[in-house]
A protein has these predicted regions:
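Long beta-strand-rich cores associated with HINT superfamily self-processing modules
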Residues: 508-533
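Gly/Pro-rich hinge or "lid" segments in bacterial periplasmic/extracellular proteins
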Residues: 155, 162-231, 235, 243-245, ...
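Ligand-site clamp/hinge motif
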Residues: 223-269
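Structural transition elements
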Residues: 324-369, 387-390
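N-terminal lobe/hinge region of extracytoplasmic solute-binding protein
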Residues: 33-83, 201-202
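Extracytoplasmic/peripheral linker and loop segments enriched in polar/acidic and small residues
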Residues: 351-357, 408-421, 444-512, 533
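Ligand/substrate-recognition segments at binding pockets and active sites
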Residues: 213, 356-360, 364-437, 478, ...
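Surface-exposed binding/hinge segments that line
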Residues: 91, 110, 121-184
Length: 533
């Protein structure tokens, strides 16, 4: 009976996917599964990768990425860099329009950036704006919102003043948190403006046609987009689902063209079938430990937990996607003043397969010193994560901790939106974490663990660490910046407030007929130029 019910569920899922598409054979319609219902698709408030999928197709910032991944003008046609790199003058395209036909003007960016840093709004990504003059003081409630270093000179000229020269600024403003939103729309509809296609007004290559809660988001080509002639698909159809088996079924029958959701245990077989591709990704996977917890406040316990994990087993036997075991936080591919930040910085503890037994012995010794010999007296901690491969990974870790340290843990699964709120509220003892590069600079990772960061889920607080981060944010000397960030990373990793697990790759289910997708190392893949053979 259970098998019959499961088969009926998969059939129903496939029917739902097909019913979302009026013509699955239409080469101008791309059907995508980026995951279940996103928590938000508001550019100013989104903090999750899945939300970015929808936002990058319906909105556009001052800059954007070309087909080959280079930073080029988006709404801004060109710009000037003045005052030793601390002032930018952006000249906006006069033919840039919102999807309802209204022009995109400089004041739209002023409103949107001020909205992000407004403490009353509470954007969790407000830290991204810290290079902008006064942003940090505003989010701390020490200065008024209108003191932010952004000003509309006229409708098509925007001035931005920075705290210090910021080499990655043009890359930064291509990120979703810097996209414009419409003040009149937000004022009129409040938080509900993102829930209906009629009010979800953007300025990107596509516009919302349907928003069906927990089912689908359907987009059509935005004829008011300034560069509409380069947009290939007529429609993008996002099916909102978590079911891995249904995703595979959809790819095989042609009702889905692309899916982030897949059964990781089947990676090798799906590759052999030609249905799966593995893409590089600049991202870190790690565990967050709440160091305000009485037991986890002891660094000996945290270090023991980290050392008792066999990362090589995880990537070879569990994830199987070509990931790299991690003994640091910032991933490979992030730039240093010269060369690679990761290669220059190296690792902070030995994670080689041949050294694992030594790590386990040290972990046992540390637990005994902390008062928990063979796990005696150690409490049963909850580990929180969203469903999917995160659970499979922790089940392996759970067994390692039980076998080598004698401790028990309990897995608590939470749906995606609930889990995001749990982490933000720090309602946890330990949980899974992951960070995908927003722009190519180590500060994008290391800034997360400044004491004031809303994304500091471990409640890590270190005055010296904050000082290093402040140096990285306020000096224009790249060598000084990078030296400070190397020192910051060393402090963070050696605190074991986080447990680095591995550096990501990204396995994706892809219809073999799908071509010309822009695959991004941030995992914000674009379908603007995609088509099907």
């Amino acid at each position: 009976m259970k098998n019959l019910i499961f088969k009926l569920f998969i059939a129903a899922s496939a029917f739902m996917i097909m019913s979302c598409s009026s013509s699955v054979d239409n080469k101008n319609v791309i059907t995508i599964n980026a995951g279940p219902q996103p928590k938000t698709i508001d550019p100013s408030l989104n903090t999750a990768l899945d939300g970015c999928y929808y936002i990058i197709h319906t909105f556009e910032g001052l800059t954007t990425k070309s087909k080959d991944g280079k930073i080029v003008g988006g709404v801004a046609e060109n710009w000037e860099i003045l005052d030793n790199g601390t002032k930018y003058i952006f000249h906006l395209r006069t033919n840039a329009k919102w999807s309802d036909g209204k022009p995109v003007v400089a004041s739209d960016f002023v409103y949107s950036w001020q909205r992000v840093v407004d403490p009353a709004v509470g954007s969790q990504y407000s830290f991204q704006h810290e290079p902008v003059k006064n942003a940090k003081a505003i989010t701390a409630g020490k200065m008024p919102v209108d003191s932010l270093g952004i000003k509309a000179i006229d409708d098509y000229t925007l001035e931005v003043v920075l705290e210090a020269p910021t080499a990655y600024f043009l890359d930064l403003v291509a990120f979703t948190t810097f996209y414009p939103v419409r003040k009149d729309i937000v004022d009129k509809y409040g938080d509900t403006w993102i829930l209906n296609a009629e009010t979800y007004i953007g300025n990107g290559p596509f516009k919302a046609a349907e928003i069906n809660q927990d089912e689908s988001i359907i987009m059509v080509k935005n004829t008011n987009y300034w560069n509409v002639s380069e947009v290939v698909p007529q429609e993008l159809k996002f099916v909102l689902m978590q079911n891995e088996t249904a995703s595979v079924a959809g790819i095989k029958e042609g009702s889905i063209d692309f899916s982030r959701i897949l059964p990781t245990q089947d990676i090798q077989s799906l590759m052999k079938e030609g249905l799966l591709q593995i893409k590089p990704m600049l991202a870190s996977y790690f565990y967050c430990l709440n160091i305000t917890n009485e037991v986890l406040s002891d660094i000996r316990v945290r270090k023991a937990l980290a050392l008792a994990i066999d990362r090589n087993y995880i990537v070879e036997q569990v994830t199987k996607g070509g990931e790299t075991p991690a003994n640091a936080f910032v991933p490979y591919g992030i730039n240093d003043a010269e060369g690679s930040f990761r290669e220059n910085g190296g690792g902070f503890f030995d994670i080689s397969a041949e050294n694992y037994k030594k790590n386990v012995e040290e972990a046992k010794k540390l637990m005994a010193e902390a008062g928990y010999p063979d796990g005696k007296g150690f409490p049963v901690f909850e580990f929180k994560a969203d469903p999917g491969f995160h659970i499979s990974i922790f089940e392996a870790v759970q067994q390692m901790w039980k076998e080598h340290l004698g401790i028990d843990t309990k897995i608590v699964q939470e749906e995606w939106a609930v889990f995001l709120q749990t982490r933000y509220d720090k309602n946890l003892t330990m949980c899974r974490g992951g960070w995908f590069r927003d722009f190519n600079d180590p500060i994008n990772f290391l800034g997360l663990y400044a004491s004031y960061s809303p994304n500091n889920y471990s409640s890590y607080s270190n005055a010296q660490y904050d000082a290093y981060i402040q140096t990285a944010l306020t000096t224009g000397d790249q060598k000084v910046r990078m030296e400070a960030m190397h020192k910051a990373e060393e402090l963070l990793v050696n605190s074991y407030a986080i447990i680095p697990m591995y550096f990501y790759t990204e396995p994706l289910l892809v219809n073999p007929k799908l071509k010309d997708v822009y695959y991004d190392a941030l995992s914000m893949h674009k379908f603007t130029y995609a088509s099907k053979e």
